[in-house]
Amino acid sequence: MSRFDVVVIGAGPTGLACGIELKRRGVSAVLIEKGCVVNSLYNYPTNMVFFTTPELLEIGDIPMTSLNEKPNRTEALKYYRRVSGYYDLDIRQYERVESISGDDGAFVVHSADRHGCPHAYPAKKVILAMGYYDRPNLLNVPGEDLPKVIHYYKEPHPYYGHDVAVIGGKNSAAITALDLHWTGARVTLIHRGEALSNSVKYWIKPNIENRIKSGEIKAYFRSSVVDIRLDSILVGTPEDEVLLKNDFVFAMTGYHPDLGFMSAHGIRLDPESRRPYTDPETLESERKGIHLAGVLVAGMHTNEIFIENGRFHGKKIAEAIAASLPQHNEARG
């Protein structure tokens, strides 16, 4: 078994940033990713445009270019592939981490690859940078397991001419509803709040509000889906329950980090926010030797950490780890 100074779990932008900063300091690291490199970005809508500018997505001091003011998904995927190759990061794709055993300085990370073959990686330190996009917030209603229920919106074409419901009231729900509407789907928006969230981007909100006002997109506020059936959905409204004809349901209800994995591995979480307790200077958890990076630091408040600020976690953690390893301290001396 190859021994590494650090195992980084997750190869999204934050995980890549950790790998880069460790390599810059001469700290050996392997990144283990359950999907492909930047798997969450790969699963974004096909034609998605970021709400930010290229320089705010950059890692490793490698410039990102875009044909427009805001980069799109394809440009981001190309950029992170290029950065990974430039730094020659050791990334094990399509390999899922099952558990972490051992203690600070003598961990073993256990995983299984896509063929089910087990692997073990001895390491002195571990960084959790798993993100949250692979765990949707479920509706917990009958019928949610039907194939017509979709938690990850990709593109509108397959839903042309169909009756679709979009659940949610934030950016992803608004964008999904508009995209489906403009492509010829019959769209109903269902949201438990009084109105669309104020967090919906300023250039999107008036657009969807006008479509709702004109009746082009039907909307039920202060409402929720209570039952999903093969060709319909039952919606609970303030007045009564309404049965709607339905072909597809897009549950744009957000996502959450793998809190169970952290708890099972001795990482204590705040009971209310579910934020892990970490040292703010090193992002080390209360389980000594395990550091957290990216959105995991925010617990259930996933709207606080983005690529734009999570990318800086790598430098902070790498500096702390490099300073703690005996061979690096000896080299400095």
Predicted regions and their residues:
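A conserved FAD-binding loop/helix module that cradles the flavin
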Residues: 294-332
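FAD-site-proximal beta/loop scaffold in flavoenzymes
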Residues: 144-158, 255-304
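A Rossmann-like FAD-binding core segment of flavoenzymes
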Residues: 88, 92-113, 120-123, 182-273, ...
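Predominantly flavin-linked oxidoreductase catalytic cores and closely associated redox partners
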Residues: 102-104, 116-189, 193-204
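Beta1-alpha1 glycine-rich phosphate/pyrophosphate-binding loop at the start
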Residues: 11-89, 174-202, 271-272
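Glycine-rich, N-terminal phosphate-binding loop of Rossmann-like dinucleotide-binding domains
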Residues: 11, 130-131, 253-254
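Residues at the starts of beta-strands that form the adenosine-phosphate
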Residues: 5, 28, 163, 185-188, ...
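Beta1/beta-strand and adjacent pyrophosphate-binding region of the FAD-binding site
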Residues: 2-14, 162-167
